[in-house]
Amino acid sequence: MDIKVYEEQVYRIKLGKNPLTESAFQKLIIKHLVNDDGYQCRKSSSYDPVYAMDVDLLFGFFERTQANQMEHLHALYNGGSRATILAKIRNAIAGRGLIDCIWHGVQFDAGIELSLVYPRPSADFDRKATALFDENVLSVMEEVYHKEGERIDLVIFLNGLAIFTIELKCESSGTGWDYRDAIRQYKFERDCKTPLLMSKVGALAHFAMDLHEVWACAALKGADSKFLPFNKGVREEGASHETRAGNPVVSDGIATSYMWEYVLTKDVVFSLIYDFVYYARDRKTNKKKDEKPIFPRFQQLRAVTRVAEDIMMAPGLTVRSRLSMTVRSP
């Protein structure tokens, strides 16, 4: 769809004159991520369903940030270095989980290690750490086939690693579908055993989103998939100030715009990965095989961020500590 066409649709829906199509909704999100959040927009043909990766983007990151290690690996594995590196990364993710590999990197032969991601530095005056952090690349793809005949609306990548999937619905369009239909698709029409959707191995969270609500799932299990609201909540007027489910009405925009204007920004994505996402073991068995991925609700993300902001403003806090707290609350 032409940019002018979908921008006109967005403008008109704000005026209540006509519905927003799902295609226009997708492109609105992509445009904001690219223009305002520094994302790269990648073609779906760049996606490798075997690895759930944008392989070229991942290897570009390696070559920019770890050229010496890559030179040694190329020499070590001869002509098959790319395939061998990918196989070892895939095996590491299958054994340890994606988030652990993001946190701790992947070991190769001869004691060589590759970092998949560089975390936010603890202080801005650490120039080397800041430069490496700046090399991290967030990207977005639309209409991604994770297997033949099954397509995901949007996939978010970090250095070529798929970290979030999003199914979009527009209840204002002719279908009348909303987030519940997106949840149904995830549960009954998506193969959760593919590398992209498999628990621990694939994306860290899966979002079902329409114009008014967002729901998230950390582990797809077919019909047993548990989606939880990822909404801001609506504070009621009056003395009680109670908060009810859903999102506040946005008179001049879309109620779920906080997803692309806040949640998917670089600072918040890194906060989610390093401060919130983890695997919880079953209290009874305490075994690794029984670990369950945990992803926060939006209120938890917002509450912790606001506490961090309050601490940051506390008298006596060192400059170093202030600089390490960069995520703003919505």
Which residue ranges define each predicted feature?
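ATP-dependent helicase/translocase motor core
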Residues: 1-330
